[in-house]
């Protein structure tokens, strides 16, 4: 999927709509996280609930949130390395629909396992149309889980290409997930950066619109680990300072004799902003 950005490096509305459409298509397709379970064996397949066309209607605020999340996911993957990042899906063993109960269980897992096992993570709570809750996480591992991984073969449930590191993760979650009330789990490498944005943000947009009922008001659907927050905050602070300096420099030249020069500077700043966004994956506002 080609993601288009404006001159300031932000994702365009058209790109966000495309991401939402991709999220809808994948939510209704045979995604690995919905039909395959490489951590907890399950004999039955639970088809995903179809989403209504309302999921295509993106509010301005949601577009901004999705754009920010998309950039953060991109920067996360670029920072920790594609080979060391994976998608972790956690599904409760029972039918949990209360977001407070879901978060209570997740907090226990977060404190005892996630904070110690992974370098950083981004977590999205996904309420399905039925009300059942599960979690999608982007986790940064200490080992390469991607090298040699044959994605088409794995989608056919042939796991022979999986390396030792990812097999170790699968084994770990088979033993650990039930202790925290989780059943079916899955950890998969990220196939590509654009796919990562499409799958992760597409799910957030489509399911967020469809399933944000009264009981989910005030519930944080997206959460960043402490290390992920520090990483993104440091990058944002640096670029904000850089942007401020450029802006001050720009406005200091506004006089009756330098209108043409200011216009040239504005053009240069737009190009500069887009370049910084392309290199770092962080939006200059």
Swiss-Prot record:
Function: Essential for autonomous replication of the phasyl DNA replicon.
Record carries keyword Lyase: no
Protein's UniProt name: Phasyl DNA replicon protein arp
Gene encoding the protein: arp
A GO term for molecular function: DNA binding
InterPro entries reported for this sequence: ORF2/G2P_dom
GO terms of biological process kind: DNA replication
Keyword entries, A-Z: DNA replication, DNA-binding
Disulfide bonds: none
Coiled coil: none
């Amino acid at each position: 999927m080609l993601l288009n950005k404006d001159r300031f490096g932000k994702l365009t509305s058209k790109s966000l709509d495309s991401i939402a459409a991709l999220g809808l298509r994948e939510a209704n397709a045979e995604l690995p996280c919905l039909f395959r379970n490489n951590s907890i064996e399950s004999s039955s397949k639970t088809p995903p609930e179809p989403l209504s066309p309302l999921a295509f209607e993106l509010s301005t605020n949601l577009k901004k949130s999705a754009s920010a999340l998309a950039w953060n996911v991109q920067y996360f993957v670029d920072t920790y390395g594609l080979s060391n990042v994976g998608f972790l899906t956690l599904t409760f063993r029972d039918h949990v629909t209360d977001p407070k109960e879901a978060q209570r269980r997740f907090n226990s897992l977060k404190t005892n396992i996630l904070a110690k096992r992974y370098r950083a993570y981004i977590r999205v709570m996904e309420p399905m149309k039925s009300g059942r809750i599960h979690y999608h996480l982007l986790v940064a591992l200490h080992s390469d889980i991607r090298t040699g991984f044959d994605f088409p073969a794995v989608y056919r449930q042939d796991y022979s290409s999986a390396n030792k590191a990812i097999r170790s993760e699968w084994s770990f979650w088979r033993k650990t997930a039930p202790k925290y009330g989780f059943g079916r789990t899955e950890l998969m490498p990220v196939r590509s950066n654009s796919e990562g944005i499409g799958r992760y943000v597409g799910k957030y947009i489509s399911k967020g619109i469809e399933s944000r009922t009264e009981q989910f008001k005030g519930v944080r659907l997206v959460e960043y680990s402490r290390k992920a927050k520090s990483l993104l905050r440091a990058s944002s602070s640096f670029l904000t300072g850089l942007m401020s300096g450029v802006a001050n420099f720009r406005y200091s030249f506004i006089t009756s004799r330098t209108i043409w020069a200011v216009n040239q500077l504005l053009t240069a700043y737009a190009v500069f902003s887009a370049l910084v966004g392309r290199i770092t994956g962080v939006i200059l506002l």
